[in-house]
């Protein structure tokens, strides 16, 4: 009798109707089940895809850009500048004019003489550009460059003489002490 009461107690809330909670999967009332744990996430916002191109109202006005102004230093320090050559193109006076240079109406600094460009400090926070006349220093006759140039000159002379049929004797080949 105790078994029948326990079975009746177990099936007490069940019915076989189509609207019963048993057929829908609700076992909580009939069978004691461990409590369900659920984790809730925040609602997802709609996915927005951004691209490199701006689209929208007035998109025909997008995609325009002006060409660069070609500003900056044109002749660097210790390089040769001819008269009238542009040294720096700038907006404003980032560089101030020094000796032998002029300042154009668009703040372009240009050379007035033929010489070397020098960038100098002008106060604590300014820079000055000057052009100094180039002093030509005499070349060392024993330098590598001069010896190489002389060697190639002798080779050209020998080659030219061979073509003409005359063989030149170099100054090293003739000896006046033994003969």
Curated annotation (Swiss-Prot):
**What InterPro entries does the annotation carry?**
Ribosomal_bL27, Ribosomal_bL27_CS
So where does this one cross the membrane?
Answer: none
Transit peptide, from-to: 1-51
Per the similarity annotation, which family is this? Belongs to the bacterial ribosomal protein bL27 family.
Q: How does it assemble?
A: Part of the 50S ribosomal subunit.
Q: What is its main location?
A: plastid
UniProt KW keywords:
Chloroplast, Plastid, Ribonucleoprotein, Ribosomal protein, Transit peptide
Q: Name one GO molecular function term.
A: structural constituent of ribosome
NCBIfam families, per this entry?
L27
Q: Which organism is it from?
A: Nicotiana tabacum (Common tobacco)
Instruction: Tell whether Ribosomal protein is among the UniProt keywords.
Output: yes
Query: What cellular component terms from Gene Ontology apply here?
Result: chloroplast; ribonucleoprotein complex; ribosome
**One Pfam family of this chain:** Ribosomal_L27
Q: Name one GO biological process term.
A: translation
Q: Which gene encodes it?
A: RPL27
> Carries keyword Disulfide bond?
no
What is this protein identified as? Large ribosomal subunit protein bL27c
The subcellular location is:
Plastid, Chloroplast
């Amino acid at each position: 009798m105790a078994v029948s009461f326990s079975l009746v107690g177990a099936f007490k809330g069940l019915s076989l109707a189509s609207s019963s909670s048993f057929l829908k999967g609700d076992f909580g009332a009939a069978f004691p089940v461990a409590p369900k744990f659920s984790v809730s996430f925040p609602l997802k916002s709609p996915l927005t895809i951004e691209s490199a191109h701006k689209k929208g109202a007035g998109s025909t006005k997008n995609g325009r850009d002006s060409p660069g102004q070609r500003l900056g230093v044109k002749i660097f320090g210790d390089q040769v500048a001819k008269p009238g050559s542009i040294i720096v193109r700038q907006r404003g006076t980032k560089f101030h004019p020094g000796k032998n240079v002029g300042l154009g109406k668009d703040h372009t600094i240009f050379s007035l003489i033929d010489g070397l460009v020098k960038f100098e400090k002008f106060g604590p926070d300014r820079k000055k550009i000057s052009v100094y006349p180039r002093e030509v220093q005499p070349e060392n006759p024993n330098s590598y460059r001069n010896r190489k140039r002389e060697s190639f000159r002798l080779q050209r002379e020998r080659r030219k003489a061979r073509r003409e049929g005359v063989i030149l004797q170099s100054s090293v080949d003739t000896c006046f002490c033994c003969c």
